[in-house]
């Protein structure tokens, strides 16, 4: 998760980082929570992590890297990659970071920078839908993400209109694992709402 999101005063003003981490791990049956810094500029979600990095396999994370000098997220993404490369997963493995390009400077109709992200893709049972933005990096991003999901059809779909409302395809969908693909060991049951914790 990002510190920008879960430590934002508008979300969990009375909880410390340690308290938030304990609540998340207990609720999800997790063993380790990986923290990174900030999300994308102008992100409607206060920096949800699914706009900057995604686990694609155990120990393997896909993240965007800036390719242009005018990328509005140049510093955030460079820091993210450096941070991810220094982290280990719950099994103690150093993360493998697969880089895809950032779409760069994507503007809305009012000429404001949009929080455009290729890693906010949606994974369906037999396909992957990658958000695109009419950027010169669209095709490369779709190809690189497709290589991470052999056996699935990967398509790029323009997401500018969706993004204008907040988030792209992963943000606007609710994923449900296919039957038979659950973890070997079930996580702890999710309790009711955690007092004071919002995501």
Predicted regions and their residues:
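The feature marks the mature, well-folded catalytic cores of soluble enzymes
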Residues: 1-190, 194-197
